[in-house]
Amino acid sequence: MLTDLHKVRNIGIMAHIDAGKTTTTERHLFYTGVNHKLGETHDGGATTDWMEQEKERGITITSAAVTCFWNDHQINIIDNPGHVDFTVEVERSLRVLDGAVAVFDGKEGVEPQSETVWRQADKYDVPRICFVNKMDKLGADFYFTVDTIVKRLGARPLVMQLPIGAENDFVGVVDLISMKAFVWPGDANGIVTMGASYEIEIRQLQEKAEEEYRNELVEAVAETSEELMEKYLEGEELTVEEIQAGVRQLTVNAEAYPVFCGSAFKNRGVQPMLDAVVAYLPNPLDAGPVKGHAVNDEEVVLEREVSKEAPFSALAFKIATHPFFGTLTFIRVYSGRLESGAQVLNATKGKKERIGKLFQMHANKENPVDEVVAGHIYAVIGLKDTTTGDTLCDPANPIILESMTFPEPVISVAIEPKTKGDQEKLSTAIQKLVAEDPTFRVNLNEETGQTEIGGMGELHLDVFVDRMKREFKVEANVGKPQVAYRETIKRKVDKVDYTHKKQTGGSGQFAKVQLSFEPLDTPRGTVYEFENAITGGRVPREYIPSVDAGIQDAMKFGVLAGYPMVRVKATSLDGAYHDVDSSEMAFRIAGSQAFKEGVRKATPIILEPLMAVEVRTPEEFMGDVIGDLNSRRGQIQIQSMEDATGVKVVNALVPLSEMFGYIGDLRSKTQGRAVYSMTFHSYAEVPKAVADEIVQKSQGE
């Protein structure tokens, strides 16, 4: 456990599904001496893939946090999932990292998912270095990959190494700063033993490329300061230290991204990459004090110094269920220190919590520690009310750190226990799983009485159901996936009058409202706005929130097919009340009924989620792929030629309802050679024929 924060790195490893993130992490752990046996993803033995499903599917779903040491530095690594259904995991870990290693597949270059994750990292300004992996693969092309970093990500790569040999003959790299070649000879099986790297001088073969890339690198570094620029222009050589300092500055400011290469699986190029993590990625102090706001006032900005002496503050960024300890809460400590048994304030929820045991995690092995200190990542036991995104702090110095925003689910399944005995287990399971992943939403459908789970995609929900059966031993029936439709209005309706009155002996009920409704033009943002334009006290102030609440009640069920309403602005214009008979309840009912009447007149429509789909296919199947997407009501955006291997890329917007079972159809149409990815794009109006079908279905059930 290092206390000198200059020597600490909190990093994530981010990439596309199969670019080799987990293998890269495993190699980090192997080289830093934490792991004595190598785990391979395709054997299901990787240390960071610790849930059973991950081992089976060979993909990483939850970000495991792992600590290791290299060259007298402590590296806390978070392994991120690369599958698009698990964006929340990536988003979460990026929020608490100081830097990241972006792993690219040397053959594929920047893939759709790498792009999504890269944009998420841009959102949080995370400094990154790039590792072009799988250089030993057939068709691997380092220069093509660097080119895609520029073209697809619009980023500025700093090439730090060039590969020696390609595909099966890939043996090592040339370091462009020291101009030395690092070669990992390996035996006949390509097995490279621990620490067996040695240096040889530059060879004649690649001089031209080396010279070009080294000049580019030196020029980029020279631009970081006037002194270096002068030195460079006068033709003086920059020293190795100057170049490294310049690269570090560009990296920490996220102005450029150093690029390294290797094959993690074949153990080539891993050590220089670890050196680069230490040399170029920021330490917890580089980002400066962490900012937050006062508990009751978002306008009041507060800061906490990154030091042990400052008041304690931390962000809970992940909840995991552990087989023995129950709930583990992963926290990033931004300031101060804390011992186990201490009391903290959950400032987000306004509740006090007591810290139980404290651990530094190594995938799913725990190393107990007595205290936590600023700049590190830990797992805590004993927190009852804390969920993802909550701030924990010193009760005497409350602060709320910037939290995370999570997308709304686009797909849901109905779930019901098979037996009465499963009912209780089911609700416990759902509670725990939702605490772990905030993009799962649980909803009790009042009409059908079923519990519905919403998520980010089919795989996301599959894993949920799978874990429920395995970890919580719940037997449940799972319905077919349902699309999360929404309803809205197309035109403005002025002055909708509604009077609610009841006279039944004793005190009656009376409320009169006049409202106008109009569509809000926000493809993603605001769901609803309410404005009060009543003047002169025609309706007393205290009843206005009830009108608003009544409208929101009615918005839960649209008038066409009962889906939630979105993108509506309501304005209350006028009304009347009665001294004795008016009540909050009466105005709530009036607001609700006026809304239902108004919506019917405002051309109600149904909206459906559109997905941005990207298909990569060999050229000969291009026609079939496009025809198939068209038959699914897809709008083809662009078709483009890809790399030298002749792969074509098709981008389309396709309704989610048409994408069920797509993977099977795509495989059979392209002999399993095409791949696709999809992310939520926006909500759009459903064509009339489809809308009629949806309405009929909802009434027929």
Curated annotation (Swiss-Prot):
Coiled coil: none annotated. PANTHER family: RIBOSOME-RELEASING FACTOR 2, MITOCHONDRIAL (PTHR43261:SF1), TRANSLATION ELONGATION FACTOR G-RELATED (PTHR43261). The lineage of its organism: Bacteria, Bacillati, Actinomycetota, Actinomycetes, Micrococcales. Keywords: Cytoplasm, Elongation factor, GTP-binding, Nucleotide-binding, Protein biosynthesis. GO terms for biological process: ribosome disassembly. Belongs to the TRAFAC class translation factor GTPase superfamily. Classic translation factor GTPase family. EF-G/EF-2 subfamily. GTP binds at residues 15-22, 79-83, 133-136. Catalyzes the GTP-dependent ribosomal translocation step during translation elongation. During this step, the ribosome changes from the pre-translocational (PRE) to the post-translocational (POST) state as the newly formed A-site-bound peptidyl-tRNA and P-site-bound deacylated tRNA move to the P and E sites, respectively. Catalyzes the coordinated movement of the two tRNA molecules, the mRNA and conformational changes in the ribosome. GO terms for cellular component: cytoplasm. Residues 6-285 form the tr-type G domain. Pfam families: EFG_C (PF00679), EFG_III (PF14492), EFG_IV (PF03764), GTP_EFTU (PF00009), GTP_EFTU_D2 (PF03144). One of its GO terms (molecular function) is GTP binding. It is found in: Cytoplasm. HAMAP family: EF_G_EF_2_B (MF_00054_B). This is Elongation factor G.
